[in-house]
């Protein structure tokens, strides 16, 4: 790394510390969260249990999932512990996490801090959710509309709560797209024989744009959307496609980069066209790529294999109590299963979100 590169890294580090210190001071002074609520939409990266009670094989409500969570029990999170959005909620000053909207806990005062509508195996492409009987983004939006109708009454019964403020001042997080490629496009001849990855990306971007506009029409003004991760660095992808230079699949990573470029361009267009919209693109690609290709620099011992089972492919029902070879210490691993980061990796990703998302709360 050159001298200028070192200074750039130092600048980023100190900048991050200053932002974090500012947020801590704000939380302490207010003695309450920096925003009234968090609303989460997307796929398995942010699902906290909506798939638990629907008819789908894509679940994570059994061991060893959740073994390192605060309750040491599976919740439906595709992780050994906390998700990046859980850490984000903590960083913003919340003492609890937004509940899965389909869970029994999603009622009364619990809904005053927002809700999680995400569903594993969902995506921007409706066919992805349909393939796995997951909750599509349009369906998630319908659940959000139901939330809006419920929160008015709940807020009225709590004198310190204002329903309109919850909606307009809350932060909305959208994380989707990975399942569209990994769990659909790359394995579906009806798609990859008919469309190039670039053409498929265009379809996803159209869906993304429509979703953001619909959220905006319902009152959302502070929205953060994540980029695709380095798809070619996911252990399951490496197992199926094979590694290339740097240990990751260059082809899959290039597909992710192409999509992310379109996501950034479209997001800028949306900000220009929708008055008052604060839309931030969270770069997940680079920080996770750094973890996957230089794990030792971040305190990890393994990034090619996941913790669960053999670490080559297992996820969801294939990552279960009978999976042979599951690691004892997930903090040494970047990935928990074939597709999802460990809690330790999620903490690092959340710290990156903290810096890039400061404009959403200021």
Swiss-Prot record:
Signal peptide: 1-28
GO molecular function: hydrolase activity, acting on ester bonds
Residues with attached carbohydrate: 159, 162, 264, 329
UniProt enzyme class: hydrolase
Compartment list: Secreted
GO CC, one annotated term: extracellular region
GO biological process, one term: lipid catabolic process
E.C. code: 3.1.1.-
InterPro entries to which the protein is assigned, alphabetical: GDSL, GDSL_lipolytic_enzyme, SGNH_hydro_sf, SGNH_plant_lipase-like
Keywords: Glycoprotein, Hydrolase, Lipid degradation, Lipid metabolism, Secreted, Signal
Positions annotated as active site in the UniProt record: 44 (nucleophile), 337, 340
Entry-linked PANTHER family: GDSL ESTERASE/LIPASE EXL3, GDSL-LIKE LIPASE_ACYLHYDROLASE FAMILY PROTEIN, EXPRESSED
Annotated family: Belongs to the 'GDSL' lipolytic enzyme family.
Protein name: GDSL esterase/lipase At5g22810
Organism of derivation: Arabidopsis thaliana (Mouse-ear cress)
Taxonomic lineage from the root: Eukaryota, Viridiplantae, Streptophyta, Embryophyta, Tracheophyta
